[in-house]
């Protein structure tokens, strides 16, 4: 064994061994319990960063731990490879997106391999591979046939810099999630997936996801946003139609004094009178330039315009002016709001600004509100007033009674509404999966016949940076023949949102080379669901919701029998340096390559796992990295020093051990127990590593003598340290295991179990309190009888002075911990 630890030599040796022996290749085996471990796959941006190192190290610990426990582990890796950065790079470097992407993949794959991550590289996939995206096109066509994919004209979020559509979930504080540019509203024909068909199931099944963080589940439930209420028809005053409203507050219907419509409402221009048309058109144009997020904000200044038209409150028969309002969205309900200014704050602010009438219909119990004196809306519970037959009822009871009344009178109906909107997937970019449809002037939208799939991205697109979709400028791609009528037609040039590819990759990993369809159902059933998924919380209502939706769709299409894709979810924190997330713009990036070159991959892994619990942000510390490296050197030196002594040591005989040897053995087995629980039950890798560090201190402090039983204890202790470190620092641990004389790898050795008898303390310390104050301590056997402990406590020399001349009222014993004496 070399005297000094040489990380590069050790890591090169064991990475070569794992590759040669295909150590992490997963095959279906019904005789073994499966464990599917997955981290969210990366975008091949060029280089991995410390966030990747941390994320993938967390996953690798779990994968290696489960292998040592005997599980059949699937741990794959791939690339979320379509997307806009590749096009931008093509423009900047005058290189094709495919070339840039595949070069990045090759480089990043090499980086991941240097970290010693236990991936089954045989299952590697890239979403830009034809063998991947062709099956996605087939899935799209099956969804189209089922009515789950459709095209329609609608107002969309448009990023002028990226020149593409964004889903609602991709707009953050009014800006594009990628480039941070302000988002505008634009009317476009676009393809969407009918995720709303699954809204109720997506909501219901969140309550089955007991292995997910409650924060993520709450975010999804709020995004889906189920509301129970009524749809109510408000006739137009001219008798030429009606406005349909969805409300959850039918108890306030008698107080509705005006109507607010979204600027995008289909009736908005039709309702404009001649005198108001110019104002209405100007207002609509202004609102369409404001993003949805700002329009929904509570602090938005309320603005509107009178259309010149009126509708009629169906229960009071009073005339209600119809306004367009900037805070009303087409995304929710019907895009029309019955305005009740006395009981809704936004309506109140709007009514005050435009001098609209106020009518109180819910009074606080025992009080009377005066509309003229109100300074804000009354939104609490109360007693119905000015509401006809419902006066005097509590407004909660009135909700149900009014809903029944509306249905009986044919004015409205009870209904459920969701905040969730259908998922717009059209993107005006080249580097994405082509949508497999043809646009024909005679036949309309025509699906590409399955026999003609895949629709392949042309390689001769030009990337000029002049804007627009490069795909639309490739005549050889766009010009085609209609498969129905045989006339000239034009191929769809929109490509699919990259979140489509990441919505099913975890299923494809189960059979990545399957050539008869998207999924091999038998293999999917062998591996799914993913037992542990790891990724950032920023994906809570994007990728994680879409993946759940897609899994349910593929189930209903007959490809799998899985309801939910991910049984357990761990959302890891960020890597922070100098008080901010690492980024090039902030100049606080740490290059993993430089770190590995100096210290080795195992040190990089150890620091990223030891510095903080996985779910918390990790504060970068150069001293912490040095400390991790010193610890590994200390363990290496420990093995080097004791190896000549313990080489021939036999098994431990617990009955022949002296007090110090027993103490060390107890520390060993307590550490095994703690590390096992910290890794398996809590993912508290930091405390697990800290426990191993303490054990190393205990071994070094133990003076090994020539007595055979002492040598055996030291060998057991050292081997336990190596086995416990194996998931965290795998190259290092394998090398030490080999040097200790083992001809099998650590996975074959298995995870160590602890001796239950060895972890029991021979003595425990019991504190003695008198009237709640600590006065002394006792050392007793763990199984000492209560009477004995009480007697010792009362006879303790330090306790006697507090009992003299006092009456002992009560003595309480908490086994192994406390004797509480109460005196008066």
Curated annotation (Swiss-Prot):
A motif ('HIGH' region) lies at residues 42-52. GO terms for molecular function: aminoacyl-tRNA deacylase activity; ATP binding; leucine-tRNA ligase activity. Gene3D superfamilies: 3.10.20.590, HUPs, Isoleucyl-tRNA Synthetase, Domain 1. It is found in: Cytoplasm. GO terms for biological process: leucyl-tRNA aminoacylation. ATP binds at residue 584. It catalyses: tRNA(Leu) + L-leucine + ATP = L-leucyl-tRNA(Leu) + AMP + diphosphate. It is an enzyme of class 6 (ligase). It comes from the Bacteria. Keywords: Aminoacyl-tRNA synthetase, ATP-binding, Cytoplasm, Ligase, Nucleotide-binding, Protein biosynthesis. A motif ('KMSKS' region) lies at residues 581-585. Its EC number is 6.1.1.4. Belongs to the class-I aminoacyl-tRNA synthetase family. PANTHER family: LEUCINE--TRNA LIGASE, MITOCHONDRIAL, LEUCYL-TRNA SYNTHETASE. This is Leucine--tRNA ligase. It comes from Geobacter sp. (strain M21).
